[in-house]
Swiss-Prot record:
This is Fumarate reductase subunit C. Two distinct, membrane-bound, FAD-containing enzymes are responsible for the catalysis of fumarate and succinate interconversion; fumarate reductase is used in anaerobic growth, and succinate dehydrogenase is used in aerobic growth. Anchors the catalytic components of the fumarate reductase complex to the cell inner membrane, binds quinones. Its main location: membrane. SUPFAM superfamilies: Fumarate reductase respiratory complex transmembrane subunits. It comes from Photorhabdus laumondii subsp. laumondii (strain DSM 15139 / CIP 105565 / TT01). Belongs to the FrdC family.
Amino acid sequence: MTTKRKPYIRSMAPNWWQKLGFYRFYILRESTAVTTMWFSILLIYGLFALKGGTQSWHEFVTFLQNPVILLVNIITLLGALLHTKTWFELAPKAANIVIKGEKMGSGPVIKLLWAVTIIVTMIILGIALL
């Protein structure tokens, strides 16, 4: 026997995520995908400009000097740093590191990840500026 009764569906306001700080931070963290997309498009544009020759590269550099583009790139950098920070905080939770029968805390792992990131960044910048 079937019933024609409608199931209860709880209504949800469009601003449900604004009520708790956890949800707001989650939306902010997930929105870093937009800045990552911007950087990817910018990088592809730069590669095509590099391939296009001196004039094309000069136009790309001029494009990057636009104040609006500089502001968007600063926001992109902040988004990348936020995304990196949250992933580094997640890494110790995903890996159980046991040393001498004791589980290692998250602090040393996070510090190591940041140290490696800074060292690799400095090496890449050093090579690029030579």
